[in-house]
Amino acid sequence: MGFVKGACKKDDLKKGLFDDGEGNMVAIPDTGTCALLQPYHVSRGKLFIHERFDNFSFVDSELVSSCIERTRFPVSGWKEYEDTKGLPGLARVADLIGQLGDSEYLHKISALFYKFEELGINEGINCKSPGELRRGYAHFFWGVVHKYVENGVNLLQVTQEGKEWISRLHSHVFECEHFILDSETQTNLWFWIRKVFDLSSIIGDSWSLPIKNLILLILLDAI
């Protein structure tokens, strides 16, 4: 909810002023998307819960708020944020795997890149294209995310749906680890692939498919 303009009571859509969840108001231009609320979305989400549910006894708004807080990223250095087994820690697992294990995640890399561009993040991480962002996926997972989701992954093994999420997550990691080619290699590979398909049109379709497959396997093995 922290990304939604108008979610917090003090948000003023007409003036383009939005509560940052910490008692301050931030201005977002008409041309700015909800992505500009990224730095504040966790605090805004907590504020939303307190504003809407503090008066309802059946909702433990403090617990919900602590779960939202644990999804803050980068992760705070405070010791309590190291816990990965409690409910807030598992909420972080759900948040991370829900994003990185999304079946369409790798197709959304371009949108994520332009979100980062709007926020000025790309310059800070020296990322110049969606391809470079995709290239860093596996490193980001193993170097940053894995230690926070390991316990949650074990729990997901209990159900079939959970196993499917794990499978998609590992599939994304594997794809980014093993199918990354530099631009020169990509150019050379596609040059020879075009040659293979041009050759098949000359040879004929009756026996060209096995030949194409064999040549493509040789090309990929040579990379």
Where are each of the predicted segments found?
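A cyclin-like helical interaction fold
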Residues: 45, 61-68
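Contiguous, well-ordered alpha-helical segments that form the cores/surfaces of helical PPI scaffolds
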Residues: 1-3, 47, 66
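Post-HEXXH active-site segment of zinc metalloproteases
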Residues: 7-32
